[in-house]
Structures are given as structure tokens and as C-alpha cells.
Amino acid sequence: MTLNGGGSGAGGSRGGGQERERRRGSTPWGPAPPLHRRSMPVDERDLQAALTPGALTAAAAGTGTQGPRLDWPEDSEDSLSSGGSDSDESVYKVLLLGAPGVGKSALARIFGGVEDGPEAEAAGHTYDRSIVVDGEEASLMVYDIWEQDGGRWLPGHCMAMGDAYVIVYSVTDKGSFEKASELRVQLRRARQTDDVPIILVGNKSDLVRSREVSVDEGRACAVVFDCKFIETSAALHHNVQALFEGVVRQIRLRRDSKEANARRQAGTRRRESLGKKAKRFLGRIVARNSRKMAFRAKSKSCHDLSVL
């Protein structure tokens, strides 16, 4: 299961209390109209509220400001209208986890459309936007709060509140890769009965000469821990869009009916060549007769975020 990214920042405080900035983005990547941004206090009470049905809207309330933003694909829209509101059922909560300095904040800022200026230097933000994936709109709320100083309660709540998890490591740092493996084990313990999407992300793939973790190592780790895998470069914006669209697909595959998922995948299958279909079919037959081949087949599919 494979995907491909950037950098992190440090958090700040406002008005004597620790706060998280919530930013909303829309439209294509690149210079565009102002981005709506909200201040959200980050404390134990807020994250506890996010765990209860219907409480995410209350936790998201804050003062509206404006800031710069980048473009998302042309089919992406801003679903937050003046006077409108989000609901827990329509918003997918995505948690970014990983060691310091691997690029979690850079990936989040690209998603949120904020990369330049002093605001881009702060970590501990929440970004939300609506994107269209496979012809259907979805709202994502991306939490970049893993490294905030919230005491012992913060990691536990982060691992309990997500609809999907993105575990980021740097391909230039073997230690961050090992940390990512540890986080996957912790998630399995925290969400034993939940079938939540987990995507392993090897960021900074553009730093070829400094690479310490190969693509094969990342893919093998994803297969062993039963999660998807992708390499990104936040610096080059490589695979960042594919990452977040893949998150939406993985959530839908687990939540939606078989009929709805089959309808979405029909368009993709129509575009697939006959040769690819035959190759995939033969691969499945061979995999049934060999554990080693089955492992290889699974490792090849771990990069495909449109399938389970």
C-alpha cells in the first residue's frame, strides 16, 4: 500500500491560552481568494468533546479571520458558507502522527492552503476543506496537533478521535521510520475493534542523496502492519493531493455500502487496459498457490488507495 512528502513547525499561544488555528481551504492549488481561518482552543476538554457525537461543531466554533491560501484541484469546493455549519457526520477527522521534523506540518499546510508568511511557521493547527473525490464531495478536517504540549492526555485522545490516521516518517531519517512502526503498534492497541484507515507516509522523497529508508522497506512495513503506503515530497508537492484523496477513498471503502463503492470504482476500471486486467487476474491466481507470491501481491496493492 503506497503513497509519497515535507517539514514541521512549532506551536504558539494567544491571549494567555494555548490555541490551535483552524483554517479552511478550497479551489485549486496556487494563488486564490482568501482562506477562512478559525482559532480553536486546544485543551483536554475540546478533544474529549470531539469524541462524542455532535460535539465537533461546538469544538470548532471560533473567531473568523483571513489568510493566504494555495490552490486545490479545480473540482474542490468550499462547503462552509456564511451562516452554514459542519456536522460530525459530514466531516472526516484525519490525525497526522509521527516524529518531530518529518514534515507533518508541511503536509497539513499544503492541504490547508497556507505555506507562506509567519502563520506558516506555527504548528498545532487544524485545517479543513471540502474536496471532490470520484465525483462526490467530502469534507476533511486535518489535525496537526501531535507535537503540542498537552500533557499525557493528548496522545491518547489523538489516537481515539480519528476517522483516519496518517503516520509520517522522513525517508532521510531511519529513526523516524522506526518511530512510525511504534506508532502503528500503539494505534492497533488503542483501536483494536475499529477498522480505521492507516496510511504510512514516507516524506521528503526529493532528498535522494540523503535517503536512509528505501521504498521497499516502507512498502514491507505497510504490508506487515496492514496499512497503506505512499511516499511524498512536501517540498515539491509530490503526491500530497493523492495522499488526501486516498484518505477519503479509504474511509469510504470502510463506511459506505458495497453498492456505492462498486459504483465509484466502475469508472476507474473502465479506464484500465485489458492487459492490466489480465495481469491482475493472473497475479491473483498465482498468489493463491504461494505465500511468498501472496506477500508480493499484497505489497504491490498497498500503494493503491482506491482499494482495501
Swiss-Prot record:
Biased composition range(s): Low complexity: 48-68
Expression by tissue: Most abundantly expressed in the heart. Also found in the skeletal muscle and lung. Lesser amounts in placenta and kidney. Also detected in adipose tissue. Overexpressed in muscle of type II diabetic humans.
PROSITE patterns per UniProt: RAS
Localisation per UniProt entry: Cell membrane
Keywords, comma-separated and alphabetical: Calmodulin-binding, Cell membrane, GTP-binding, Membrane, Methylation, Nucleotide-binding, Phosphoprotein
Biased composition (Gly residues): 1-16
Positions of region (Disordered): 1-88
Gene Ontology annotations for the cellular component aspect, listed alphabetically: cytosol; plasma membrane
SMART domains assigned: RAB, RAS
Induction record: Down-regulated in failing hearts.
GO BP term, pick one: small GTPase-mediated signal transduction
Modified residues (Phosphoserine): 26
Residues recorded with modification Omega-N-methylarginine: 24
Function: May regulate basal voltage-dependent L-type Ca(2+) currents and be required for beta-adrenergic augmentation of Ca(2+) influx in cardiomyocytes, thereby regulating increases in heart rate and contractile force. May play an important role in cardiac antiarrhythmia via the strong suppression of voltage-gated L-type Ca(2+) currents. Regulates voltage-dependent L-type calcium channel subunit alpha-1C trafficking to the cell membrane. Inhibits cardiac hypertrophy through the calmodulin-dependent kinase II (CaMKII) pathway. Inhibits phosphorylation and activation of CAMK2D.
Subunit annotation: Interacts with calmodulin preferentially in the inactive, GDP-bound form. Binds CAMKII which is capable of phosphorylating RAD in vitro. Interacts with CAMK2D. Interacts with CACNB2; interaction may be involved in beta-adrenergic regulation of heart rate and contractile force. Interaction with CACNB2 regulates the trafficking of CACNA1C to the cell membrane.
Protein name: GTP-binding protein RAD
Organism of provenance: Homo sapiens (Human)
